[in-house]
């Protein structure tokens, strides 16, 4: 069996992202080595992963650890204050202390919620992330962001809490629905546009091979996307400057998610947001036509949407006012000044926003709705 590869996230408290197959042994080692005297572990998992959670529990129990499974709601429904409260109650009931560890098992919503719970329980306990979706592997699990949603917006309540380790078990991708792979490609393609054009070349060479979890291309894309994020996070953990580039496509994307009450997959919303950001860059005279057009072509090649409701702009603008990058009511977007040259666009004129939105507007219902809902 091929040895796992490791990417070190070199923040003040460095941690590894381990990429491979069959990483149960690595998980046990990461948990037992997280802190001295680990006695209790809480495994937060989403319903489809009950069997996997039990395998993890037994493996930890075999080392003498008192391991507990804690089921949380699937997808964005889990990123709720009431769910976080339930998790805190469980941690209190099982007696989880600062010497103990939390494990997250699931998609991005699971890593966001479990990370938030770990960050706030006793002002911070160790957590090991085991992302099981493509999006979680290349984005949510790496970087230390945690959060829950409120009526005011997505991820507005949260904090930074870095994991002890992230275990990316590629074998889990062979059992997830294809739609999850497609949705996760949005974050990989984003990494290509902001930092690593080789990602774009690999996807464009054979889009279907890029979506094959059993083939050689997707693991390389995952490794490259994680490396991009690791490099950015190491330079700017708390999003004071450089890290904002990871939000490319997310300003409109988060607004779409909120308008759709989180029925759209995150990756689908970000895909539309990427095209919108490219159009903003083009119309602002900062991005060349070929690179702007490349956004739409590559996203459509893997089956992601690139348009949204024509009449939605007023609602989306309202939602974008709560975006974390907005300052004193001034909208701020990440745009490109060329391939792998991210920059910022502050306070764009309303006419520019309207023109960019007209380039992604559609009147009819979206095709391929299965990947959205």
Swiss-Prot record:
One of its GO terms (cellular component) is cytoplasm. It catalyses: 7-phospho-2-dehydro-3-deoxy-D-arabino-heptonate = 3-dehydroquinate + phosphate. InterPro entries: Dehydroquinate_synthase (IPR050071), DHQ_synth_AroB (IPR016037), DHQ_synth_fam (IPR030963), DHQS/DOIS_N (IPR030960), DHQS_C (IPR056179). Its main location: cytoplasm. Zn(2+) binds at residues 187, 250, 266. Pathway: Metabolic intermediate biosynthesis; chorismate biosynthesis; chorismate from D-erythrose 4-phosphate and phosphoenolpyruvate: step 2/7. The keyword Hydrolase does not apply. This is 3-dehydroquinate synthase. It comes from Nocardia farcinica (strain IFM 10152). The gene is aroB.
């Amino acid at each position: 069996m091929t040895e796992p590869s490791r990417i070190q996230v070199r923040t003040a408290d460095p941690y590894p992202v381990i990429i491979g197959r069959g990483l149960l042994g690595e998980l046990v080692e990461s948990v037992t080595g997280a802190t001295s005297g680990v006695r209790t572990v809480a495994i937060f998992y989403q319903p489809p992963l009950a069997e996997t959670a039990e395998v993890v529990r037994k493996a930890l129990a075999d080392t003498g650890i008192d391991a507990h499974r804690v089921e949380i709601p699937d997808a964005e429904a889990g990123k709720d204050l009431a769910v976080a409260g339930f998790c805190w109650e469980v941690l209190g009931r099982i007696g989880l202390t600062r010497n103990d560890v939390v494990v997250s098992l699931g998609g991005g919503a699971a890593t966001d919620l479990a990370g938030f719970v770990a960050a706030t329980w006793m002002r911070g306990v160790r957590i090991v992330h085991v992302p099981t979706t493509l999006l979680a592997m290349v984005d949510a699990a790496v970087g230390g962001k945690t959060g829950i949603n409120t009526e005011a917006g997505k991820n507005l309540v949260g904090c930074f809490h870095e994991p002890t380790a992230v275990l990316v078990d590629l074998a889990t991708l062979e059992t997830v629905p294809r739609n999850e792979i497609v949705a996760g490609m949005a974050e990989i393609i984003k990494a290509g546009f902001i930092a690593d054009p080789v990602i774009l070349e690999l996807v464009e060479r054979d889009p279907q091979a890029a979506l094959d979890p059993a083939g050689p291309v997707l693991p390389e894309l995952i490794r490259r996307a994680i490396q991009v994020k690791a490099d950015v996070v190491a330079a700017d953990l708390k999003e004071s400057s450089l890290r904002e580039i990871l939000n490319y496509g997310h300003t409109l994307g988060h607004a779409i998610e909120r308008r759709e009450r989180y029925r759209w997959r995150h990756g689908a919303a970000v895909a539309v947001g990427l095209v919108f950001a490219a159009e903003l860059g083009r119309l602002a005279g900062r991005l060349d036509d070929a690179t702007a057009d490349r956004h739409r072509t590559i996203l459509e090649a893997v089956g992601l949407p690139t348009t949204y409701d024509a009449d939605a702009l007023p609602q989306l603008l309202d939602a974008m006012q709560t975006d974390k990058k907005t300052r004193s009511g001034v909208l701020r977007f990440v745009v490109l000044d060329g391939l792998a040259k991210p920059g910022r666009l502050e306070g764009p004129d309303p006419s520019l926003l309207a023109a960019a939105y007209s380039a992604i507007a559609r009147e009819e219902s979206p095709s391929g709705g299965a990947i959205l809902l």
